From Swiss-Prot:
InterPro entries: UPF0738. Pfam families: UPF0738. It comes from Bacillus mycoides (strain KBAB4). It comes from the Bacteria. This is UPF0738 protein BcerKBAB4_1107. Belongs to the UPF0738 family. The lineage of its organism: Bacteria, Bacillati, Bacillota, Bacilli, Bacillales.
């Protein structure tokens, strides 16, 4: 089973940032927010974790969307993933990214390319 949802673009609407993803075979209506974000250094992405009863699904937010994430964070805008015409709020995304940015800043363990990309957008 596929365990990753790839964000392809972002849209803004009043008081919300929407990450748009390709349709998937994953049963999206069964997913809920996990309030946790990981880093994918190889693909320069943040991975927001969704879950259902049996597995975790990762929403891959690529560096090409980080400017929009940063702007939404500064405005305290809610952020959602839209896939298969279903929207799920990515609860806690702002706080998780803030925490990650603090840890990534100047930390070579994440890889120079990721550190540079994060510092360029978020600092």
């Amino acid at each position: 089973m596929q365990n990753k949802i790839q964000v392809k673009s972002v849209e803004t609407r009043e008081n919300a940032l929407i990450f748009c993803a390709e349709n998937t075979e994953i049963e999206v209506k069964e997913l809920s927010a996990r309030n946790h974000v990981l880093v994918d250094s190889d693909n320069l992405s943040f991975l927001y974790i969704l879950e259902n009863e049996s597995s975790f699904i990762y929403v891959s937010i690529p560096h090409t969307c980080w400017e929009a994430v940063h702007e939404a964070m500064n405005k305290d805008t809610a952020m959602f993933i839209r896939v298969n015409d279903v929207e799920i709020e990515l609860e806690g995304l702002k706080e998780e990214v803030e925490y990650l940015v603090e840890n990534i800043e100047g930390n070579a363990n994440y890889g120079e390319e990721l550190v540079t990309a994060v510092e360029k957008v978020f600092l």
